[in-house]
Amino acid sequence: LGYSHQYLYPREIVFARRSMPKCHFVIPAGGVGLRFGGPLPKQFVEVEGLPILMHTLRAIAPYAESITLVLPQDYQKYWQQLCRDRSFDLEHKIVEGGATRFLSVRNAIESLAVDPDALVGVHDAVRPLISGETIEDLLAAAELSGAAIPYLPLTDSIRHLEPLVGSKSVDRTQFVAVQTPQVFHLERLRAAYRQADGGANFTDDASVYEALFDAPIELVVSN
């Protein structure tokens, strides 16, 4: 793994609720939802009377200094109409998305005119069930170490594909499934996105960060 192996971050040492840092959240919502199916991108699919994206924004709002929503131009008016129809007035700004997730996140980060030492968290638009406890742990860990991401242990068996033998089983305890929000010091993540090749095969923000910084990324257990 390219990440720090301190899996269970010690809440009793690093976290005091009264001094919990807040975070500038970036929500890339440009996906077309092909894996999910249906006529709409999955972030706009309704669950319990509201689009999933609204549930996601509500989940992070208590921990947010600001929220930047990244949307393709084609969906900005649609989203604004949804907000009017649902009387959804949670404060956020909209930034136009790029052709890829990488470019969308970079656009949003560049738009943040805030303290470069502030925390920025990048969270998927269709992860509304993130718990407050997980967010709090991530903010505390990132404030100390500079970078923190949530993970879950793998429960499925996994195999490594090999050209000559086809595949081989591997020890799944040596791997974890990474989730969001991924939280960083803004100045460092911004520098990583500026230096990174947008055509590289980055799978998340942590991989962009690692391309520039040889520094541990704290792993925080997710809900």
Predicted feature descriptions by range:
Residues 168-178:
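A recurrent flexible, glycine/aromatic-enriched loop bordering the glycosyltransferase active site
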Residues 3-9:
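Low-complexity, intrinsically disordered or signal/transmembrane-proximal segments
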Residues 6, 15-18, 54-117, 197:
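Conserved N-terminal catalytic core of the sugar/cofactor nucleotidyltransferase
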Residues 21-76:
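N-terminal glycine-rich phosphate-binding loop and ensuing alpha1 helix
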Residues 76, 135, 175, 189-190:
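A generic structural signal for short hydrophobic patches within well-formed alpha-helices
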Residues 99-165, 179:
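Conserved beta-loop-beta/alpha segment of the NTase-like Rossmann-fold superfamily
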Residues 46, 129, 169, 183, ...:
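Short aromatic/basic micro-patch
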Residues 21, 99, 176-223:
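Conserved alpha/beta core of the MobA/IspD/sugar-nucleotide pyrophosphorylase nucleotidyltransferase superfamily
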